[in-house]
Amino acid sequence: MADASLRLITFRVGTETFVLDIMAVRQIVPYTGSTKVPTAPSFIEGIIVLRNDVIPIVDLRTRLYPSMQERTEEALVLITHTGAGMIGLKVDEVRRIVNIAGDAFLPPPPLVRGIRGELLIAVVPHGEEIYLLIDVENVLTADEKVELREADLAEANTER
């Protein structure tokens, strides 16, 4: 990564703290439930409607830790815009926004990249904490993006 500073939003999924580029996040909303859609792909928890936009919800806990059962009652949704359209990422907690120098980003070791391929793009030490930088474009695989478009759940939101 370049030497310039990057603003990241920190959030918790399970016991780990992850970060996303703040520019990828359009809005943060409380999770009050989602509507299940019978034709939706299995990786979509449901949909919400936000300002007349239908937004598919992906539970990052399920994506990152399929066997973890414990739930957070006060989950939040990070509304993000991706090449597949707007997607809501359900997380356990949003913590804060941090500025990180570009030279602080470290490549993940090969064994750790196994969190579904290229989803984890950097390890970011910051003070006493270690953040895991995920790529919002890779939350869904290429096949899942096609499946999502075919289900027509995000396509209407790609031009916003």
List the model feature ranges, each with a label.
Residues 1-160:
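An acidic, low-aromatic, low-complexity terminal/linker signal
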